[in-house]
A protein has these predicted regions:
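Flexible, acidic loop-helix segments that line cofactor/substrate-binding pockets
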Residues: 1, 17-49, 67-75, 89-97, ...
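Conserved C-terminal structural/oligomerization subdomain of aldehyde/semialdehyde dehydrogenase
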Residues: 68, 75-172
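Glycine/threonine-rich helix-loop capping motifs at alpha-helix boundaries
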Residues: 6-35, 49-65, 83-90, 120-122, ...
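Short beta-strand and adjoining strand-loop segment in the mid-core
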Residues: 1-8, 37, 80, 172
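Catalytic cores of large soluble enzymes that bind and process phosphate-bearing ligands
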Residues: 4, 8, 39-46, 105, ...
Length: 172
């Protein structure tokens, strides 16, 4: 899930759309492909059901992607869902596939959004915040201290580096 302030949402969404268009998908034997199929048919079926649900719902829409096929593997296109509902299904449930949901919030509702981020799911493997304002960054880090197992500040979520950082545990 991604939370983006309204003041920069159009710019961010435009960049994401361009970047996703460059992702090559196909066989893992071809090293030009950045993405390959999802792990198994059950995963494919779950993710394709989610995409179908989004296409029918009023609270969300497919911004980019949304295609899938199991004719030559279990392929799900990289998909961005946008929603006006911060409690939408794809914001609260872990999908474990190439689908991300973006919620755009009013800039003046930053505190409320931080609470949403912290309360949305009892599970969160990784999280990150990107911010240029030191005050907001400091406040955010305090409020989100326990929101994810690994938390990055102005850096992409890369997951744990085994042997280099602690990993695992549970929220208190």
């Amino acid at each position: 899930r991604v939370y983006i302030p309204k003041s920069i949402s159009k710019q961010v969404l435009s960049k994401l759309k361009k970047q996703i268009a460059t992702i090559k998908m196909g066989s893992p034997e071809n090293f030009e492909n950045f993405m390959t199929a999802v792990i198994h048919e059950n995963s494919f079926d779950k993710l394709s059901r989610v995409i179908k649900k989004v296409k029918k719902d009023r609270d969300a829409k497919i911004f980019v992607g949304g295609g899938y096929s199991k004719s030559k593997g279990y392929f799900i296109e990289p998909t961005i869902v946008t929603t006006s509902n911060p409690k939408y299904y794809t914001m609260e449930n872990e999908l474990f596939g190439p689908i991300v949901t973006i919620y755009t919030f009013d800039d003046n509702k930053w505190d409320k959004t931080l609470s949403l981020v912290d309360e949305t799911s009892e599970y969160a493997l990784t999280g990150a915040i990107f911010c240029q304002d030191r005050y907001i960054l400091e406040e955010s880090v305090k409020k989100l201290e326990n929101c994810a197992g690994n938390f990055y500040i102005n850096d992409k979520c890369t997951g744990a580096v085994v042997g280099q950082q602690p990993f695992g545990g549970a929220r208190g």
